[in-house]
Each structure stands twice: as structure tokens, then as C-alpha cells.
UniProtKB/Swiss-Prot annotation:
The active site is at 208 (proton acceptor). Its EC number is 2.7.11.25. Interacts (via C-terminus) with NACK1 (via C-terminus). Belongs to the protein kinase superfamily. STE Ser/Thr protein kinase family. MAP kinase kinase kinase subfamily. It catalyses: L-seryl-[protein] + ATP = O-phospho-L-seryl-[protein] + ADP + H(+); L-threonyl-[protein] + ATP = O-phospho-L-threonyl-[protein] + ADP + H(+). Gene3D superfamilies: Transferase(Phosphotransferase) domain 1. Phosphorylated at Ser-575, Ser-669 and Ser-687 by CDKAs and CDKBs. The phosphorylation occurs before metaphase and inhibits the interaction with NACK1 preventing the transition to cytokinesis. It comes from Nicotiana tabacum (Common tobacco). This is Mitogen-activated protein kinase kinase kinase NPK1.
Amino acid sequence: MQDFIGSVRRSLVFKQSGDFDTGAAGVGSGFGGFVEKLGSSIRKSSIGIFSKAHVPALPSISKAELPAKARKDDTPPIRWRKGEMIGCGAFGRVYMGMNVDSGELLAIKEVSIAMNGASRERAQAHVRELEEEVNLLKNLSHPNIVRYLGTAREAGSLNILLEFVPGGSISSLLGKFGSFPESVIRMYTKQLLLGLEYLHKNGIMHRDIKGANILVDNKGCIKLADFGASKKVVELATMTGAKSMKGTPYWMAPEVILQTGHSFSADIWSVGCTIIEMATGKPPWSQQYQEVAALFHIGTTKSHPPIPEHLSAESKDFLLKCLQKEPHLRHSASNLLQHPFVTAEHQEARPFLRSSFMGNPENMAAQRMDVRTSIIPDMRASCNGLKDVCGVSAVRCSTVYPENSLGKESLWKLGNSDDDMCQMDNDDFMFGASVKCSSDLHSPANYKSFNPMCEPDNDWPCKFDESPELTKSQANLHYDQATIKPTNNPIMSYKEDLAFTFPSGQSAAEDDDELTESKIRAFLDEKAMDLKKLQTPLYEGFYNSLNVSSTPSPVGTGNKENVPSNINLPPKSRSPKRMLSRRLSTAIEGACAPSPVTHSKRISNIGGLNGEAIQEAQLPRHNEWKDLLGSQREAVNSSFSERQRRWKEELDEELQRKREIMRQAVNLSPPKDPILNRCRSKSRFASPGR
């Protein structure tokens, strides 16, 4: 009996559970079923004499054989801290967070979880599925998608940790800056297709591409957000009653609305709608239909959304390939990346914004470039348009191409550069050369809603060419151009054949003559009005005193050297006639002369020339202005004397009338009350009209 109990005890303590299935003979074999039942009943009882049976361990698996998601699960959870709310969507709120271990900024998307008993279990199941999907999405990495970092549960909510993008979404940028120019749309579309191609190759549909789900950083790099797990978030939020379709139907493909089954081509439709949103600033169909009406219209119509008319032919063709009604007719993201709208092949043959060259004055006329200008018609180009810069030792501009400009500076600021004007040295002033400017004027339709900072034109022609009016021998300039050409100046003779022309519809010389004449005419009118205002008695007296004081003595009429030195002549700058002529000559020269350097150098060169040539050049102008001033002075003197005579007559009549009134008042007043009579006479004198 004692041996039997000992054998049973040894079987219970030392026998492994795997040995019961071997069918071995002996005591263990005979009592295998009994011992197993006895051991299980003892373990379930409250006695707790025997320990729990040992469960065999699984065979060890090397770390290299683990799948990627299993290896990722070994990473420690992120310790984070929630900050301020930075966004609120249809299915949750987004907060800014920080990784307290590394200091990295995070975006935390908070999704509510149902807490009532009826849907609690279903909500927990959705939460587990969402966590598993986020663990899979953590392995995705691309420059144009937002990285998933993990999940964290809280009471009543699930937090999804995402990469933080500081710039904001495309929809927020549209609200701040308005619709984008086509160059920006092209750059964003290319990055959008690259990120979408990566997702499609990994078998992930986005399902909700729109401007609000495309984030932009401070360097213009876009990142797709809310992909993959968005469907699970919608299902989880639907259970809590937070589901909303506001804003979403405008980007939905027809097959998604009809629920006939959709694939990756539904994302391509949404890409086309997003391009229309960037080009117009508003979603497609939003001007015609509300959300519910848009759902019905998109599901039943056979037409695509309206394409903006201001887009180029390449962009319109790109949109037609995205917005095909039949899903199988839409191009894939990989094919669309080869489209000319994305590759910008149509712009490689010509400069993007402006062209230029480097050259010396000798060979500058042999080079050309075309830059078409769009200017308001009443703003005619003049010499001042070149900012009065007229040296020609080196002309410097730059050529900007799209591939060189992307990512380096904002495309909206390329036009704001000093390279657009020709810079020349002051020491190389040209006698005998002219700068002629005119503009190719366009109709108002050509520059409607044109912003040179945001919508740079691609074809601005500008031609620097040798003027056909000038020859190498000599340049015959008219008097109205106010340019004095010395006959014996060897300093700048090698530059006589150089000129700049900006051709227009009519002749450049005619344009220049008309412009100069109009400026001189306007200036003369203005000065004539100023002269009339200055013709006062004080001015006449001052002018007469100057004439008397400036009369030379008879001794100095024969020889200039015999003029006495003690005569008090007024300074030349104080003489009205000379001051006016100096103003007029300066203004006329400023209308055609390129820079202030012109005046100083012209005077220095005139000093070494023959005096007779200078007198011949200045004599017609002096005679003309002398006659004009004489006629105006006579007219002003006659009008002033006439006006003075009338004033004197009116004053005499008024005084005579007042004396008559006072005489009548004295004769009619009774001598009884002298004080009252005195008051009445004073009141009548104060108001003689009574």
C-alpha cells in the first residue's frame, strides 16, 4: 500500500504532461488519465497544494526571421505631452504635442471612443484594428507623406501620433494668399503625384484627397496626410455620432458616391479636383451646388467639373486625363508624372521669366533678346524708365529657368530684381548716341487680372539693337532732343554708332519726337501759368530796379575789359529771365538726357569748344524766350493797369456815396437828442448800404 501511494506521488510531481500522450507502459501509462483528471481538479480547488502545470515554451525564432511589424512593436512607446489645439476636423481634433524624450514636435489626432454599453464592444474592436493599421503605416517613409509615429489610448479617446508639418494645409494657404499661379500648381501637383504613387505601390488608397489634407512646410514641400487609416477613423467616429460629410463631396469620384466599387483611380479624380481648387481658390461645383445637391449631381452627370479658362493647354489636357467619368480611362499616378504639364517640357526651349547677356559696348549690338512687356496703355515708356542709368561699359542681366528656380526662392518674387534694368558705368557717357524708348502696347484683355509678382509672363520681349537712324559717321540730333553734339570731340567718337531701341508699331524716331514735343509743350504751359502768377506790382518794381541797376556804363560798351568793377550787378542766379531760361533748359535736357552726369560732362566739354558754335546753338532759344517773355509782360502790364484803374474808380465812387449819406443824415437829424443822433449816424456809417 505504501509503495502504491509513493508511485502515485512520483507520477504527479515528476511526470511531464507531454509524456501522457506517448502511450508508454507502466504505472504512468495505466494511471495517465486518472492523474491528469486528479491534477486538474486539485488545481481548480482552493487547496493549492500543487503548482500549475508547466506549459512548454515555443521554439525560439531568430530576430532576422521576424516580420517588419513585429520588429517595430519592440520599440518603446513615445512619451509625449499635449499642447494647444491647432485644428478641428469632421472626425476629431488635432493638437500640437512634444516628445518629452527627444524634444521633437508632434501632431496628435484625437478620436473619440463610444462609452455606452451598446456600442462599446464594437468601438473597442475598431480601436484595435486602427492600432494595428497604424503599426503597419509606421513603416512607410516618403518625403511627400506624413509619417505615422504611433498610438496612445486615453479615457474615452484614441490619440494618433503624427509627424508635425509647420506650414499648414493648401486650403489654409488659399484662404491667405488666394489662388495659386500655374507654376506653383505644377510644383505641388508633381509632389502630390509622387506621394500618391508611393502609396499606391504599397497597396494603400488615400480615399480623401483634398486641399485640407495636403500639408505644406516652410520650404514648399507638400505632404499627404490622413491616408490609410482614415477609413477606420471614419468608422470609429460614425459610431460616436461625429460623422460629417461637409466639404467632402466636392472631391469625391462618381463611383465613390454611387458605391459601385472603387480603386486607386478614385484618388486620381480627387487629384484633378484639387488642382481646380488650387487654380480657383474654391472646390469644383461649390459655386453651383451645396453639399447634398453636389452629391446628386456628381453621381448622375456625365460631364466633368468646369475647367478654369486661364490655365494653359497642357494643364487642361492634364485635368481631362484625371477627370474621366469611367474609372478605367483615368491615368495612373506613374503615367501622370510623365505628362508635359508636370515635366514642364514646353518651357525648356525658352527662358522662364527674363533673359539677358553680358557684353561690352563694341559687341553688344550683335546680341539680341526678346522680352515682351505688358504695360498699361497710358504709361508710355520714356528715358526715365531705365532709371536714368546710361553708362554702357557692361550690361548685366540674368536668365532664370524653371528648374533652377524651384525650391530656391519664391516664384512670386522673381520679378522683383535689379537685374531687370541695364546697369552702365557713369564714365562712359556717350555723345552722339540716343536712348529711345517705346512700348508695345496691348489691349486690356491681355493684362486682365495680371499680377507681375504672382503671375510672371513667360515671353517678355526686349530688344537691344543698333538704331537704323544712326550711322558710324555722325548722329544728326534735332534741337527738340536737347542734345548738344560737339564737332571736334575725339573722346567719345568711337561710340557714335551705338544706340538702344525699343521698337513699337510706329517709327521709333516719330515716337521720340512726339514724346519730346508733348513734354516741352506741357512744360511751357506750366511755366506760363507760373509766370502769370508772379506778375504782381512787387515783382514789377523788383524787375525795374534790376533793369536800372544792371544797365552798363558807356565806358564798357566798346570793350568788355573796361567795365568798372564797382557796379553792383545782381547775381546771375537771381535774374528772373536767366533763372527761367535755366529752368527751361534743365527741364528740356532732363526729358531726353539719360542722367545727371550728362549735364556736368556736357558743360565740361563745351568749355573747350569754339564760342561761336555755342552761341549759334543757344541763340534761337534765347530769342524765342525773349519774345515770349516780352509779349507776356506787355499783356500782364496792360491788364494790371486796367484793373488798377477800375479799382480806383470803384473806391472813389464808394467814398463819394458815403459822404453823401453822412451829409443827408446830418441835415435830417433833429437837434433834440444829440446822443441818439450820434448813435444813429454811427450805425449808418457802419452800414452805408441802408
